[in-house]
């Protein structure tokens, strides 16, 4: 989701004067709902994408204060690993974040630029037209655990893209 939304925000910034309709389908019931991990976040990409992210209250509130890497021998004993052995593990200037919170914040930024975001709608099938991807069909709703249609059943919706369809998984 972070990659999806970041790419869309970048596209909108580059094409500010062009009328575009952009839609993001998120399989989770809420943005960031499938992002369970924390992260040590390096801000270079965010600095380029949204230079005023600090003023916009991006959820980067905990700066890294210290790096410590230890080799765990058992539940009581560990050996510190000297920092010169792990030069890429220097995190000065980075932030400890919740990726789910960053996803939600990026979604807010995208929506403020006119992106329509629809959580709870996984893309289940690809629609092809003349040999090219033309859109997607969302997953059916209202089926029981065995796949049988309940009274609340609704078939998936067809969503067509005028220009392009981007598929992304992970971040």
Over which residues does each language-model region extend?
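Feature captures the FAD/FMN-dependent oxidoreductase FAD-binding
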Residues: 57-171
């Amino acid at each position: 989701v972070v990659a999806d939304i970041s790419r869309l925000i970048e596209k909108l910034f580059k094409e500010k004067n062009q009328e575009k309709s952009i839609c993001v389908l998120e399989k989770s019931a809420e943005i960031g709902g499938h992002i369970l991990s924390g992260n040590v976040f390096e801000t270079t990409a965010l600095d380029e994408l949204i230079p005023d992210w600090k003023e916009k209250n991006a959820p980067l509130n905990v700066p890294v204060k210290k790096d410590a890497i230890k080799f765990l021998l058992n539940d009581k004993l560990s050996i510190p690993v000297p920092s010169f052995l792990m030069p890429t593990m220097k995190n000065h200037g980075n932030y400890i974040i919740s990726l789910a919170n960053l996803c939600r914040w990026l979604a807010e930024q995208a929506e403020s630029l006119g992106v329509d975001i629809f959580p709870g709608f996984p893309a289940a099938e690809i629609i092809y037209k003349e040999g090219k991807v033309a859109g997607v069909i969302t997953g059916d709703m209202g089926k029981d655990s065995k796949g049988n249609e309940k009274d609340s059943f609704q078939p998936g919706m067809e969503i067509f893209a005028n220009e392009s369809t981007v598929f992304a998984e992970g971040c």
